[in-house]
C-alpha cells in the first residue's frame, strides 16, 4: 500500500475515534475500544437472554461462589452501545449478592457510563434486564436444590 493511502486511513480512524469519544464520553469510549467480560461461561449458575425492541439480543452469564458472583460475562449481537452496556452490567455484578444485584438497573448503568446518546439509552436497560433474568435463573436453580 502507498504511504498516502496509509496516512488517509490513519487520519480517518483518528477522526472516527474523536467523533465517537465526543458523542459517548471517555468512559464509554474506552470500554467500546476494549469491552471487558465479553464471552460465555460454560455451565453458568445463572443465565439470562433478552431481545430488545431494537432487535439486539443480550446474554448474561453468572457463576456464584459463597453466595456472591464470582464470574460474569456477556454476549450480544447488538451495536457498540449494547456491547458497552453489557460489559458494565457484567462488571457491576462481580462480587455482589443476589440482593445487591437487584439494585443494578438501566439507570445505574447509565450513571456509571456518564453519558450515552439518547437513542442508545435503551441498551443499558436491555443489559440490566438480561442481568436480572440471569439472577432469576440462578434463584430458581437454588430453590430447586432445596427441594
Q: Where are the language model's segments positioned?
A:
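Short, solvent-exposed loop/turn elements at beta->coil junctions and helix N-caps
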Residues: 45-50, 75
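Immediate flanking context of iron-sulfur cluster ligation sites
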Residues: 68-77, 111-114
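Short, thiol/selenol-centered motifs that function as redox-active sites or metal-ligating centers
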Residues: 54, 76-85, 123
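C-terminal binding/interaction regions
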Residues: 1-42, 47, 65, 96-147
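A short catalytic or substrate-binding loop motif that flags glycine-/basic-rich loops and adjacent residues
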Residues: 41, 51-55
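Short beta-strand elements
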Residues: 56-67
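Flexible, glycine-rich terminal cap/loop adjacent to redox cofactors
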Residues: 88-98
Amino acid at each position: 500500500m502507498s504511504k498516502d493511502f496509509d496516512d488517509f486511513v490513519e487520519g480517518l480512524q483518528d477522526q472516527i475515534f474523536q467523533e465517537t469519544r465526543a458523542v459517548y464520553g471517555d468512559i464509554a469510549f474506552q470500554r467500546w475500544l476494549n469491552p471487558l467480560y465479553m464471552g460465555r461461561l460454560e455451565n453458568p449458575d445463572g443465565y439470562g437472554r433478552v431481545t430488545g425492541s431494537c432487535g439486539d439480543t443480550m446474554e448474561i452469564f453468572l457463576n456464584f461462589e459463597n453466595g456472591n458472583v464470582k464470574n460474569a460475562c456477556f454476549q450480544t449481537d447488538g451495536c457498540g452501545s449494547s456491547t458497552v452496556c453489557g460489559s458494565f452490567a457484567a462488571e457491576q455484578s462481580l462480587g455482589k449478592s443476589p440482593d445487591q444485584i437487584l439494585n443494578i438497573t438501566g439507570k445505574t448503568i447509565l450513571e456509571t457510563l456518564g453519558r450515552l446518546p439518547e437513542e442508545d439509552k435503551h441498551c443499558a436497560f436491555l443489559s440490566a434486564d438480561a442481568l436480572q433474568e440471569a439472577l432469576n435463573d440462578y434463584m430458581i436453580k437454588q430453590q430447586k436444590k432445596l427441594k
